[in-house]
């Protein structure tokens, strides 16, 4: 009987414990459900989203680069970049041949690359595809292959304006030319968008744009694409005709300081830089320095006139065409002259005559004029790789160095500097800052040569081109032109002295001479066919480009020849054009 009593009392107790435990467990589960779905809902949702919500950059295109008239020189086009997660791609090896073929890649090289990066989660497959090409690859639905939208630079004018505009790298950053110099201005600011991604990294939902992309700013250059094409064509033809190694041509607006054209040969296509040679990338107009030779004689003459000791009608005895200075002999190319006035010294390009004037006025005054017009000085353009050159300044000037300075040896300049100096002379002695961007208001200039002296030298240089025995090949049909040729021996690299039979042929001038609008410098490096004098090689290029440029700019002719005069010009014997 006792056993039955205890058994009857024990079973209800056990039942209550079990039921209580079950109720507690159910209560705990219900509480947890309430906790997850009500109390901690926002926190847990945020934690879940944090594991699937990502911020993706919205690419911003670079600013448009145009010429002065709005013609596009550099534009950004949308492209597709394909990337892969090698860890995922390793699970689909059977698809690799198909993917490699779609990418235009060798299957074995593709497989080797994926296997070498098997532990990584990101590698580029190919960049810069057209959107259509990218969509075609993505449509294959190969696991681990994804796309990114980017922008790539395209240069409509190609090689014609390559050295001025430059180019960007694969990440759309400026690397040469204007693209580098104005990179901060042109570069856009990427935006951000919030997206949901699945476990494979694929975007399954766009949530919101958190930051709008800000495109780069438009930049209008001073370049006139019409003049640039003209200069490019004629310079290229000149190199072919003369068997030359390289060349440069610069056109400047004398009033505003704008560089209207700047071209070099050889050049390159910025849209296709495969197998690009370093020599083709040289912006020679700004990087190559050279002795300017006789092209600086007008500035030596300016110093003489400014000194008050000389006037245009003064006579200098240049016979017999040589002048001995110690062990150094100064020689004229033409030695059939006896006495020359100052204009005659420029027409005949007499080294003896300009040296005698330099001895009288002193090298310091010549140095001062050359410095003020910008020879061997920083141009202020801030162009990548631009060189300054050298204008020596001796504490005491020996006679030989005084003479060589006067006729353009012993100093080094760039084509841009020489064009700037001639622009100042053409602008009545007023130098205005150089600009590679369009100038909408004529800047203030600095009077570096008096207007009276500048006007006199302008007239002399007009005679250099138009007088009998002058550089007739520089004459511009329909316009009065002014300028000076030069022929400079090339310095030997690594040894003292000059190279044998290696010259730079130069011509610098401006037009119309009666009211100058543009200045131009032509440099032909190492011509090897018909000759090497600047008046023979570079002057014809000046004539053709200047004539075309003035007409394109709608500058009215100021020297239309009569029919008889035109026949005389065509029948003129091939002489003159000394450097």
Swiss-Prot record:
It catalyses: Preferential cleavage: (Ac)2-L-Lys-D-Ala-|-D-Ala. Also transpeptidation of peptidyl-alanyl moieties that are N-acyl substituents of D-alanine. Gene3D superfamilies: 3.30.450.330, DD-peptidase/beta-lactamase superfamily, Penicillin-binding protein 2a (Domain 2). Keywords: Carboxypeptidase, Cell cycle, Cell division, Cell inner membrane, Cell membrane, Cell shape, Cell wall biogenesis/degradation, Hydrolase, Membrane, Peptidoglycan synthesis, Protease, Septation, Transmembrane, Transmembrane helix. InterPro entries: Bact_Transpept/Beta-Lactamase, Beta-lactam/transpept-like, FtsI_transpept, PBP_dimer, PBP_dimer_sf, PCN-bd_Tpept. The chain crosses the membrane at residues 15-35. Residues 558-579 are annotated as: Disordered. One of its GO terms (molecular function) is serine-type D-Ala-D-Ala carboxypeptidase activity. Induction: Mainly produced during exponential phase of growth. Pfam families: PBP_dimer (PF03717), Transpeptidase (PF00905). Pathway: Cell wall biogenesis; peptidoglycan biosynthesis. The active site is at 294 (acyl-ester intermediate). Residues 561-570 have a biased composition (Polar residues). The keyword rRNA-binding does not apply. It is found in: Cell inner membrane. GO terms for cellular component: plasma membrane. Its main location: membrane. It is a single-pass membrane protein. Its EC number is 3.4.16.4. It comes from the Bacteria. Catalyzes cross-linking of the peptidoglycan cell wall at the division septum. Binds penicillin. HAMAP family: FtsI_transpept. Belongs to the transpeptidase family. FtsI subfamily. This is Peptidoglycan D,D-transpeptidase FtsI. It comes from Pseudomonas aeruginosa (strain ATCC 15692 / DSM 22644 / CIP 104116 / JCM 14847 / LMG 12228 / 1C / PRS 101 / PAO1).
């Amino acid at each position: 009987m006792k056993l039955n009593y205890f058994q009857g009392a024990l079973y209800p107790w056990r039942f209550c414990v079990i039921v209580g435990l079950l109720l507690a467990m159910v209560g705990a589960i219900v509480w947890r459900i309430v906790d997850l779905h009500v109390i901690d809902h926002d926190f847990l949702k945020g934690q879940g989203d944090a594991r699937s919500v990502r911020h993706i950059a919205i690419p911003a295109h670079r600013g448009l680069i145009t010429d002065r008239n709005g013609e596009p020189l550099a534009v950004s086009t949308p492209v597709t970049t394909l990337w892969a997660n090698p860890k995922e791609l390793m699970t689909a090896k059977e698809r690799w041949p198909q993917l490699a073929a779609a990418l235009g890649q060798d299957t074995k090289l593709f497989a080797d690359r994926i296997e070498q990066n098997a532990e990584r989660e990101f590698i580029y497959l190919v960049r810069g595809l057209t959107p259509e090409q990218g969509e075609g690859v993505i449509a294959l639905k190969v696991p681990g292959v994804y796309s990114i939208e980017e922008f790539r630079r395209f240069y409509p004018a190609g090689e014609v304006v390559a050295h001025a505009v430059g180019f960007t790298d694969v990440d759309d950053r400026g690397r040469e030319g204007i693209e580098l110099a104005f990179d901060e201005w042109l570069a856009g600011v990427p935006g951000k968008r919030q997206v949901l991604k699945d476990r494979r990294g694929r975007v399954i939902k766009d949530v919101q744009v958190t930051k709008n992309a800000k495109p780069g700013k438009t930049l209008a250059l001073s370049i006139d694409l019409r003049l640039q094409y003209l200069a490019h064509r004629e310079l290229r033809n000149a190199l072919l005709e003369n068997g030359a190694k390289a060349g440069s041509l610069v056109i400047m607006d004398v009033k505003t300081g704008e560089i209207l054209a700047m071209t070099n040969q050889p050049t390159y296509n910025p849209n296709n830089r495969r197998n690009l040679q370093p020599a083709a990338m040289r912006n020679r107009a700004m990087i190559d320095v050279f002795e300017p030779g006789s092209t600086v004689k007008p500035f030596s003459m300016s110093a003489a006139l400014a000194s008050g000791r000389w006037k245009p009608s003064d006579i200098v005895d240049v016979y017999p065409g040589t002048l001995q200075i110690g062990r150094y002999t100064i020689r004229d190319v033409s030695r059939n002259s006896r006495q020359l006035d100052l204009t005659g010294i420029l027409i005949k390009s007499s080294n003896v005559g300009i040296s005698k004037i330099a001895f009288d006025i002193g090298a310091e005054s010549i140095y001062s004029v050359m410095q003020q017009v910008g020879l061997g000085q920083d141009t202020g353009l801030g162009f990548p790789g631009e060189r300054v050159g050298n204008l020596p300044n001796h504490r005491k000037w020996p006679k030989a160095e005084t003479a060589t300075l006067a006729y353009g040896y012993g100093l080094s300049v760039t084509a841009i500097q020489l064009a700037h100096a001639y622009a100042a002379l053409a602008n009545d002695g007023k130098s205005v800052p150089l600009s590679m961007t369009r100038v909408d208001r004529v800047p203030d200039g600095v009077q570096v040569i008096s207007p009276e002296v500048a006007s006199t030298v302008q007239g002399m240089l007009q005679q250099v081109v138009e007088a009998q025995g002058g550089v007739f090949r520089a004459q511009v049909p329909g316009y009065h032109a002014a300028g000076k040729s030069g022929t400079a021996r090339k310095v030997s690299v690594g040894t003292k002295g000059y190279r044998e039979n290696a010259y730079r042929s130069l011509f610098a001038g401006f037009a119309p001479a009666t009211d100058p609008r543009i200045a131009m410098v032509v440099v032909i490096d190492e011509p090897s066919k018909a000759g090497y004098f600047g008046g023979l090689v570079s002057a014809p290029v000046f004539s053709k480009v200047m004539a075309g440029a003035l007409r394109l700019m709608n500058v009215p002719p100021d020297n239309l020849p009569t029919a008889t005069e035109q026949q005389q010009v065509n029948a003129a014997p091939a002489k003159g054009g000394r450097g």
